[in-house]
UniProtKB/Swiss-Prot annotation:
The lineage of its organism: Eukaryota, Fungi, Dikarya, Ascomycota, Taphrinomycotina. Residues 13-189 form the PITH domain. It is found in: Cytoplasm; Nucleus. InterPro entries: Galactose-bd-like_sf (IPR008979), PITH1-like (IPR045099), PITH_dom (IPR010400), PITH_dom_sf (IPR037047). Keywords: Cytoplasm, Nucleus. PROSITE patterns: PITH. Pfam families: PITH. This is PITH domain-containing protein P35G2.02.
Length: 207
């Protein structure tokens, strides 16, 4: 297995003119991203964009039955995560927090409430403009990543939809030598089958 490298230099077909030089954008298996509770099928994978399209609102994702969105993001190798960037809107569609669950292939809305998040991050209650927030993670907790679950929700249990315009991941990456293991997810879940997660179980932060 070759040594770690930064995907913008070695993987990306369209290198950045500006922005993070340690993006994991091209190291994500974007065609295999699954988003649970998305209003428009396959819209969730489109918010994982190259840096130069981070303010392009042609593609956004909106939640369907309630405020929750769960992204299941597979990598084309072993990734180490340094930070996550999220762009949201300054209105009622903004999520209040998100939680990270590395290397889990068994999570959906039935099971995630029973699992301790590795880290949980909160967005500011008020902000102006469509802002990109960057959240550094505890890198030691996100090494040898083959997949990452990102769970967005609101603290008030609102039924207003959540919208996200951009998600970016920063870190380093070692590609697989052989073919990656393919995991089959429930691509089109029925929201009625997935009760809302107890907010008290999700809102824990670790610093």
């Amino acid at each position: 297995m070759s040594g770690p490298h930064h995907c913008s230099a070695d993987c990306d077909e369209h290198p950045f003119e500006s922005g993070p030089n340690d993006t994991l954008y091209s190291c994500i298996r974007k065609e295999s991203i699954v988003t649970l509770n998305e209003a428009v099928p396959d819209s969730g994978k489109l918010v994982f964009k190259p840096w130069d399209l981070r303010y392009d609102d042609t593609d956004i994702v909106e939640s369907d039955a309630d405020d929750q969105l769960l992204f299941q993001v597979p990598f084309a190798g072993a990734a180490t995560l340094k930070s996550i960037l999220v762009r949201i809107f300054p209105n009622e569609t903004a999520p209040h927090s998100f939680s990270l669950f590395p290397n889990r292939t068994d999570l959906d809305f039935d099971t995630i409430g029973d699992v301790q998040a590795t880290e949980t991050f909160e967005f500011p209650l008020t902000f102006e403009g469509s802002h990109i927030f960057e959240f550094p993670v505890k890198t030691r907790l996100y090494q040898n990543l083959q997949n990452l679950n990102i769970f967005f929700t609101k603290s008030d249990g609102s039924d207003d939809p959540t919208q996200i315009a951009y998600i970016g991941l920063r870190g380093s990456f070692v590609p697989f030598k052989g073919d990656p293991v393919v995991t089959i997810y429930e691509a089109t879940p029925r929201p009625s089958d997935h009760p809302k997660v107890n907010q008290e179980e999700v809102f824990r932060s670790y610093y």
